[in-house]
């Protein structure tokens, strides 16, 4: 397998695992995952609002997840670890699921979108963007965006400091897609800089030279021009 095909295969497998965990752990407030390869296997960290539901009674559910990750999705020696989300309002995936759930329960899309924006910003986020796409009010599909604060849309910062969450709401008119982007508090923005004040500034150098003396010396060193009398 070429290196390009390997990258594509790893990306497809990660998306499949993400969809599987999102479906199985919806009641637990699934907030994303992280996969890291180690010398002894693969470390899979699951972030959830309710870790107890992920673990299950006597660890039954987490053992089932480990078996499925190994046999169905081909992850080598998976070691599943569950971590609780410190602040669910700052987790993009959890907020996307909450927004989709509110839309399914009949909330007006503007009220639901602004409510998510307000919760995220009140929790200290630097920026938040909510995108709702689908048949919102009529037969024609459209896209509605809600933005507040600082959001980066392109470049490396959009991948490193912006957290993204995706969810779908199933309604009678069709499926509504939901996307939530959050810039968490404490993120280092690309245009942010600090000016450090030196504790002891260096003293200014005083040059002991006389400009006029140097100029006179240069004139004295130059030969005098010879004038030829015209006949």
Swiss-Prot record:
<keyword id="KW-0694">RNA-binding</keyword>
<keyword id="KW-0699">rRNA-binding</keyword>
<comment type="similarity">
    <text>Belongs to the universal ribosomal protein uS3 family.</text>
</comment>
<dbReference type="InterPro" id="IPR005703">
    <property type="entry name" value="Ribosomal_uS3_euk/arc"/>
</dbReference>
<dbReference type="InterPro" id="IPR015946">
    <property type="entry name" value="KH_dom-like_a/b"/>
</dbReference>
<dbReference type="InterPro" id="IPR001351">
    <property type="entry name" value="Ribosomal_uS3_C"/>
</dbReference>
<comment type="subunit">
    <text>Part of the 30S ribosomal subunit.</text>
</comment>
<dbReference type="GO" id="GO:0003735">
    <property type="term" value="F:structural constituent of ribosome"/>
</dbReference>
<dbReference type="GO" id="GO:0019843">
    <property type="term" value="F:rRNA binding"/>
</dbReference>
<dbReference type="InterPro" id="IPR004087">
    <property type="entry name" value="KH_dom"/>
</dbReference>
<protein>
    <recommendedName>
        <fullName>Small ribosomal subunit protein uS3</fullName>
    </recommendedName>
</protein>
<dbReference type="Pfam" id="PF07650">
    <property type="entry name" value="KH_2"/>
</dbReference>
<dbReference type="GO" id="GO:0006412">
    <property type="term" value="P:translation"/>
</dbReference>
<feature type="domain" description="KH type-2">
    <location>
        <begin position="17"/>
        <end position="86"/>
    </location>
</feature>
<dbReference type="InterPro" id="IPR004044">
    <property type="entry name" value="KH_dom_type_2"/>
</dbReference>
<dbReference type="InterPro" id="IPR009019">
    <property type="entry name" value="KH_sf_prok-type"/>
</dbReference>
<dbReference type="Pfam" id="PF00189">
    <property type="entry name" value="Ribosomal_S3_C"/>
</dbReference>
<keyword id="KW-0689">Ribosomal protein</keyword>
<dbReference type="GO" id="GO:0022627">
    <property type="term" value="C:cytosolic small ribosomal subunit"/>
</dbReference>
<comment type="function">
    <text>Binds the lower part of the 30S subunit head.</text>
</comment>
<dbReference type="InterPro" id="IPR036419">
    <property type="entry name" value="Ribosomal_S3_C_sf"/>
</dbReference>
<keyword id="KW-0687">Ribonucleoprotein</keyword>
<dbReference type="InterPro" id="IPR027488">
    <property type="entry name" value="Ribosomal_uS3_arc"/>
</dbReference>
């Amino acid at each position: 397998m070429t290196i390009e095909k390997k990258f594509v295969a790893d990306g497809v497998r990660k998306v499949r695992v993400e969809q599987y965990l999102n479906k199985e752990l919806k009641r637990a407030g699934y907030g994303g995952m992280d996969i890291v390869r180690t010398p002894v296997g693969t470390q899979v960290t699951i972030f959830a609002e309710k870790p107890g539901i992920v673990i299950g009674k006597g660890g039954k559910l987490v053992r089932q997840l480990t078996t499925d990750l190994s046999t169905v999705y081909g992850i080598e020696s998976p070691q599943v670890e569950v971590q609780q989300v410190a602040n669910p309002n700052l987790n993009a995936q959890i907020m996307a699921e909450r927004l989709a759930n509110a839309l399914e329960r009949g909330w007006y899309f503007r009220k639901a979108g602004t409510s998510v924006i307000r919760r995220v910003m009140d929790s200290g986020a630097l920026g938040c963007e909510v995108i709702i796409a689908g048949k919102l009010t009529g037969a024609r599909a459209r896209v509605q965006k809600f933005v507040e604060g600082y959001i980066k849309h392109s470049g490396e910062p959009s991948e490193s400091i912006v957290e993204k969450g995706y969810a779908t709401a199933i309604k009678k008119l069709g499926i509504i897609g939901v996307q939530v982007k959050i810039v968490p508090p404490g993120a280092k923005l690309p245009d942010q800089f600090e000016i450090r004040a030196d504790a002891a500034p260096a003293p200014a150098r005083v040059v002991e030279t006389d400009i006029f003396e140097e100029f006179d010396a240069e004139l004295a060193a130059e030969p005098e021009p010879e004038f030829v009398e015209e006949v």
